[in-house]
């Protein structure tokens, strides 16, 4: 397993997530927004690992599951775009104009609808990795960094879901 192989697999994973998001939601913009959160989450995880003195090695970073990382963002972005379509349709039916303010309102409305569920789902996933933080010995050296990488990447994905995704959707 080389760094080249891991990087290659990461790129393929991001492209697959992008393609599936675009295929199933039928919205190129939402696919781009979801794909944009992956580098943020990965950088966040590696930064936290390095700041803690941990090694962001091939085993820990290579084990990442981007599906878990972007899960919350997919839900948020889909709900935001659903709200935007509803507001746009209302504007076309003569119920006001569709402006930047109405886009912002759609983002706020959509975010408030799903934020608790997204937060608690991510918290449960992160909590499932916490026992692995305390392992000692060989197991701790193998599974500890992997668990931390997962937890930090999901936390980074959650931060991106509540910050990066709504801003990009508003533009």
Features from the language model and the residues they span:
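Hydrophobic regular secondary-structure detector
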Residues: 1-171
């Amino acid at each position: 397993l080389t760094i080249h192989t891991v990087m290659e697999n990461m790129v393929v994973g991001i492209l697959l997530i992008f393609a599936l998001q675009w295929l199933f939601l039928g919205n190129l913009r939402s696919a781009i927004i979801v794909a944009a959160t992956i580098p943020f989450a990965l950088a966040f995880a590696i930064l936290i690992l390095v700041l803690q003195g941990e090694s962001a090695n091939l085993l820990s970073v290579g084990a990442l599951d981007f599906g878990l990382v972007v899960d919350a963002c997919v839900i948020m972005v889909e709900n935001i775009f659903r709200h935007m379509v509803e507001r746009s349709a209302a504007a076309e039916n003569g119920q006001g104009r569709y402006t930047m303010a109405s886009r912002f309102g759609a983002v706020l409305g959509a975010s408030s609808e799903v934020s608790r569920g997204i937060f608690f789902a991510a918290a449960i996933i992160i909590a499932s990795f916490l026992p692995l933080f305390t392992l000692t010995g060989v197991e701790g050296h193998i599974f500890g960094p992997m668990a931390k990488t997962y937890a930090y990447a999901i936390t980074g994905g959650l931060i991106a879901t509540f910050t990066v995704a709504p801003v990009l959707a508003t533009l």
